[in-house]
């Protein structure tokens, strides 16, 4: 088993070389993004393939797909939430990393479903395996059901937008909206990540907290 990172160390090339030197020929690659997105899952797959080819490693690569609805992932997510929720919490916000709407359209293999059919994310289609928004909605529903939450006790939003045309609702707006509705004890979970990072620790835990408290 080797760990590799896109923009840090150990690099993908270094980790693939380590596996090759160990005599491995067939490699299972697990992009640690629970939900499929062009900017994360797809670009990671393409980069691993490129390095394998350019470096002449000749490794047989198999990529493990999105795991947004796997029982183990949902249970782990629920455990994290239960272990960290405030006592007498009023509300749970599922805040996901945002992506441009155009990415949803580009990854739709049917070219006729995403953002073109009413309530597209609620309908089963050939686009779902590649639709980030539909997948995060399903993750949230599965988790909320397992936690026994009523529909008025949780919501979904998207953080880190850059410019117009990104999927909504936006987290910063939702934080203000919830505060204005009288929510006082809010819990926020970021299921798009399997580990904490600058986005969860600073943007959400610091900036998001400040936005909510000042609303």
Task: Set out the residue ranges of the language-model regions.
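Active-site-proximal alpha-helix that buttresses catalytic centers in soluble enzyme cores
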Residues: 1-215
């Amino acid at each position: 088993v080797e760990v590799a990172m896109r923009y840090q160390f150990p690099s993908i090339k270094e980790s693939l070389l380590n596996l090759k030197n160990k005599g491995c020929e067939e490699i299972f690659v697990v992009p640690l993004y629970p939900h499929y997105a062009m900017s994360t899952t797809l670009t990671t797959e393409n980069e691993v393939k490129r390095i394998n080819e350019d470096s002449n490693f000749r490794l047989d690569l198999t990529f493990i797909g999105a795991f947004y609805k796997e029982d183990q992932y949902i249970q782990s997510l629920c455990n994290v939430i239960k272990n960290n929720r405030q006592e007498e919490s009023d509300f749970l916000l599922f805040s996901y990393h945002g992506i441009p709407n155009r990415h949803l359209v580009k990854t739709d293999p049917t070219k006729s479903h995403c953002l073109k059919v009413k309530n597209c994310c609620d309908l089963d289609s050939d686009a779902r395996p590649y639709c980030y928004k539909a997948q995060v909605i399903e993750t949230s529903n599965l988790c909320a059901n397992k936690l026994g939450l009523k529909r008025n006790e949780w919501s979904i939003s998207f953080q880190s937008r850059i410019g117009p045309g990104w999927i909504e609702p936006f987290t910063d707006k939702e934080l203000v909206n919830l505060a204005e509705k009288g929510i006082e004890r809010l819990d926020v979970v970021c299921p798009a990540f399997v580990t904490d990072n600058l986005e969860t620790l600073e943007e959400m835990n610091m900036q998001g907290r400040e936005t909510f408290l000042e609303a």
